[in-house]
């Protein structure tokens, strides 16, 4: 049975004026029309839910775990939450990430989330010839991103738009090679309604493709 995990990386989780949220809501409406009624869809809102960051508590916990030492209550709590996030991610086989573009990169909470799921021996492993992804079982990834500028004109802005490069590289590294991005871009320089309509068409096609794979 297919399980879809929505990863909402917008700081204003349910802001209906947000372009990326509008495009996501349109995608979800279309997607639900294509998939069976009993198919599971879960959602994690990174700016509402607890998503641990790598800080001194996490580093201390990892060091103690490696040495077989007892964790403090705080360390135990944070590592349990990180494990919950990891297992939720691993249990899905279709992913949808929703994000705005912030200073040419992903929102900070999405980076924290990536640090929770990129775990050796869980989503990748080390070998004598290099690291190998452990999620090579046909998983699919859709990224829905909104931006005021345009980043596909093969110019300076294309070079410094790191969010797409980072996400694609990291998920490919984990073994998720079916990766697609839908950009609602140019909202500050183009007709916003035209940008939305173009993105709506793209996510409708993406919804059909993901549901029928």
Curated annotation (Swiss-Prot):
Family classification: Belongs to the azoreductase type 1 family.
Reaction(s) this enzyme catalyzes, per UniProt: 2 a quinone + NADH + H(+) = 2 a 1,4-benzosemiquinone + NAD(+); N,N-dimethyl-1,4-phenylenediamine + anthranilate + 2 NAD(+) = 2-(4-dimethylaminophenyl)diazenylbenzoate + 2 NADH + 2 H(+)
HAMAP family per the UniProt record, alphabetical: Azoreductase_type1
Annotated keywords: Flavoprotein, FMN, NAD, Oxidoreductase
Quaternary context: Homodimer.
GO MF terms, alphabetically ordered: electron transfer activity; FMN binding; oxidoreductase activity, acting on NAD(P)H as acceptor; oxidoreductase activity, acting on NAD(P)H, quinone or similar compound as acceptor
Lineage of the species this protein comes from: Bacteria, Bacillati, Bacillota, Bacilli, Bacillales
Taxonomic superkingdom: Bacteria
InterPro entries xref list: Flavodoxin_fold, Flavoprotein-like_sf, FMN-dep_NADH:Q_OxRdtase_AzoR1, NADH:quinone_OxRdtase_FMN_depd
Entry-linked Pfam families: Flavodoxin_2
Signal peptide: none
EC number: 1.6.5.-, 1.7.1.17
Reported function: Quinone reductase that provides resistance to thiol-specific stress caused by electrophilic quinones.
Obligatory cofactor(s): FMN
Residues binding FMN, per UniProt: 18-20
Origin species: Bacillus cereus (strain ZK / E33L)
Protein's name according to its UniProt entry: FMN-dependent NADH:quinone oxidoreductase 1
């Amino acid at each position: 049975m297919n399980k879809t995990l929505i990863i909402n990386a917008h700081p204003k989780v349910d802001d209906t004026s947000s372009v990326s949220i509008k495009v996501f809501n349109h995608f979800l409406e279309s997607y639900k029309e294509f998939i069976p009624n009993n198919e599971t869809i879960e959602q994690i809102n990174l700016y509402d839910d607890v998503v641990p960051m790598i800080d001194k508590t996490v580093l201390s916990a990892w060091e103690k775990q490696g040495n077989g030492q007892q964790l403090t209550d705080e360390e135990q709590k944070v590592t349990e939450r990180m494990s919950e996030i990891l297992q939720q991610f691993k249990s899905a086989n279709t992913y949808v990430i929703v994000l705005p573009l912030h200073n040419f990169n992903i929102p900070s909470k999405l980076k924290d989330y990536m640090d929770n799921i990129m775990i050796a021996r869980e989503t990748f492993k080390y070998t004598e010839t290099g690291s190998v992804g452990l999620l090579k079982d046909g998983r699919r990834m859709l990224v829905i991103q909104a931006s005021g500028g345009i980043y596909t004109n093969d110019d300076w802005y294309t070079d410094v738009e790191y969010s797409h490069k980072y996400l694609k590289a990291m998920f490919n590294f984990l073994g998720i090679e079916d990766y697609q991005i839908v950009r609602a871009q140019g909202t500050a320089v183009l007709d916003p309604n035209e940008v939305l309509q173009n993105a709506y068409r793209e996510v409708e096609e993406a919804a059909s493709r993901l549901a029928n794979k």
